[in-house]
Amino acid sequence: MKTIASASLPKNVQMPQYDRQRLTSRIVHFGFGAFHRAHQALLTNRVLNTQGGNWGICEISLFSGDRLMSQLREQDHLYTVLEKGADGNQPIVIGAVNECLNATLDSLAAIIEKFCEPQVAIVSLTITEKGYCIDPSTGSLDVTNPRIIHDLQSPDEPHSAPGIIVEALHRRRERGLPPFTVLSCDNIPDNGHVVKNAILGMAQKRSPELATWIQQQVSFPGTMVDRIVPAATDESLEEIAQALGIADPCGISCEPFIQWVIEDNFVAGRPQWETAGVQMVDDVLPWEQMKLRMLNGSHSFLAYLGYLAGFQHISDCMQDNAFREAAYRLMMTEQAPTLHITNVDLNQYAESLLQRFANPALKHKTWQIAMDGSQKLPQRMLEGIRIHLSRQSDWPLLALGVAGWMRYVSGIDDAGAAIDVRDPLRDKIRALVELSSLSERVSALLSLREIFAPDLVQNPQFVEAIEQAWQNIAQYGAHQAVMQTLKNSQFLPFSGTKRTFVLSALLFLSFFRQDC
């Protein structure tokens, strides 16, 4: 059977421009998901195209993804990224992956030994918040997690990502091999420290001596990742097949924009990612906060309220004047003043985000973005709210976003249709929803300490603002609530250069007030 590895592809398809036979597994990556395929692997492919080298990627999946891995092997570890822009699509065949391992197809033993090979310099991860096995209330290793319990009892046969990495580092140390860099590429705040806490927490439970060695020898760079990559669908895979003239079950579609900011702290070398446009910096935090609050915060706002209002895709929300204006104002009047970043035009950044959101080719579903909200709400909205509370400044759209999440997880949209809520806390949330009336819903959901810390729950201003926003959605529906909030909140009736000037002045004053 022909695959993209053996078929003759159209001339407009970008193919690998390097000798794939030279590749070795210098990067071992947990999580062959959509985002990794269209982001880290693609940027590594770019480096190989221009610089050559042997920085191959071995893809790892543990207890799922065996079918995808089988399909990847059948096409010589090649797959397609279809960049979809307003001016057309660009298919790119990625060749940076040189092998893959799966616990079902291969074995856990084979996976662990792969990490112990001498050439491995980087272990990277896209495993979502859940994969790090961190207790969100403490930021420490969750020792009640079933996989962590198993790994502590059977450390040489681990089932979790932290357990596997610690066991691999233990074996490398015993064999006199150098350590590797652990690189989180997940879209979570302070991801370098998150994975470091997970690894050191696991190592400390096993052996304080091992934990000390890891602390001294292993680096955990922070990263900021940005690219809109919707989950693959039958429709997107068919579009890729049309572009190639042959099916690619591992293919993925995404927007043209891509950004990766990395703390330049690697103990065993790295690809020359900067030649592919990656920003290597000393401190990732300002970039991370900008992206989490302005992009992800407005994305979540549109996802919850847009879904409730009947919008299937983010681009549909952008066709609505009220939702578009709300997203812009949320970014510039509520989120931007909470940031500490220099040499970045935040108004230009916000305008570029609106253009990206409006891309109709992506078909990024509001339902997909609304998933796992309990894990996302704190960094995307609640941190900004804390800053506003401390400054006594206004945050009506952030309040509406939080209330929108509460309405969404209550399980019924504005048309009365049931919502398929996907969240790690779904059972807890469902129990609270079922035991509370609509008038009690806010106080019930605020009891979720995994999301809402005491400093917020005990703040009357916070509770009152969320209650009012909830009542607006419950009474008027999400769309009308957005319009009402825009009408009632302070706004700037300007456009173009004048709006940019006024917003810049407001940002300057907010920073000045904070410094005072």
Question: What residue spans do the PLM features occupy?
Answer:
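Substrate/ligand-engaging "lid" and interaction regions
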Residues: 1-494, 512
